[in-house]
């Protein structure tokens, strides 16, 4: 017999003052996740969820819009100060940082957590355009 699952309320308003913003910027998209200090997600957004498609997802403007959206949702839960962890080589890193600061969140530290291979896997071949 299948057990009944207990479901948590999804949009329940939390009161969290400090958190961590994880900015994952790849060559194709930029994702922003704002979590509490333990790592539980508070809000998230990406360039794709903001309505950008294809190569427009990788633009700095799309990253800015996604960061503003995630920051607004986090501020609804009482978020005031954040640490920022930036990951990836994409073009949306700087603009996402600026958008988080402009949204009214107080940034205490910025950390680059991009994984660096110590001669690991062979990288993809060069593009011939």
Swiss-Prot record:
The keyword Iron does not apply. It holds the Pfam family Ribosomal_S11. GO terms for cellular component: ribonucleoprotein complex; ribosome. Keywords: Ribonucleoprotein, Ribosomal protein, RNA-binding, rRNA-binding. PANTHER family: 40S RIBOSOMAL PROTEIN S14/30S RIBOSOMAL PROTEIN S11. Located on the platform of the 30S subunit, it bridges several disparate RNA helices of the 16S rRNA. Forms part of the Shine-Dalgarno cleft in the 70S ribosome. Part of the 30S ribosomal subunit. Interacts with proteins S7 and S18. Binds to IF-3. This is Small ribosomal subunit protein uS11.
